[in-house]
Design a protein with these regions (language model features):
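Mixed-charge (Asp/Glu-Lys/Arg
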Residues: 1-143
Length: 143
């Protein structure tokens, strides 16, 4: 479900602190999103805004430069200076090159998974393990 994925992505970015202490984060209306799936206002006045594109594709899919150019066009239409494109798949080298030059952050499926684990979004700890090491100082001192 694309809407669920968009909500997950926005929730992750909020959990990472992108909406700030008093900011807001919303998933845009699907029928009229103009190529932007989420908007994060990082402050109450909305002077610092991050626009988000979220695409849930098969992991073997590669997103190319044209998709990033389309997102860049959507950003330009709202006079945005920053955007994040998040996918469950990967990006081509040309997509990375274009995004870097336009100030667009790309997060692929591997990085998305790492961030979800790091910030505890959609996961829970099932079990923890103790890892022991030898305390050499203990054995060097006389009892």
């Amino acid at each position: 479900e694309p809407v669920f994925f968009e909500k997950l992505v926005i929730h992750l970015l909020e959990t990472m602190g992108y909406s700030g202490k008093h900011g807001t984060a919303v998933v845009t209306s699907k029928s009229n999103d103009g190529g932007i799936d989420g908007i994060i206002n990082q402050d109450p006045l909305g002077t610092s805004t991050v626009y988000v594109q979220a695409k849930r594709y098969h992991e073997t899919n590669t997103i190319g430069r044209p998709a990033i150019q389309g997102f860049y066009g959507a950003l330009a239409a709202v006079n945005a200076d920053r955007g994040v494109f998040i996918t469950t798949s990967s990006f081509s080298a040309n997509a990375h090159e274009f995004a870097k030059n336009q100030g667009i952050v790309l997060i692929d499926g591997i990085k998305l998974t790492e961030l979800m684990l790091e910030f505890g979004v959609g996961v829970e700890i099932a079990k923890t393990y103790k890892l022991f090491r030898i305390d050499n100082d203990y054995f060097e001192d006389e009892l």
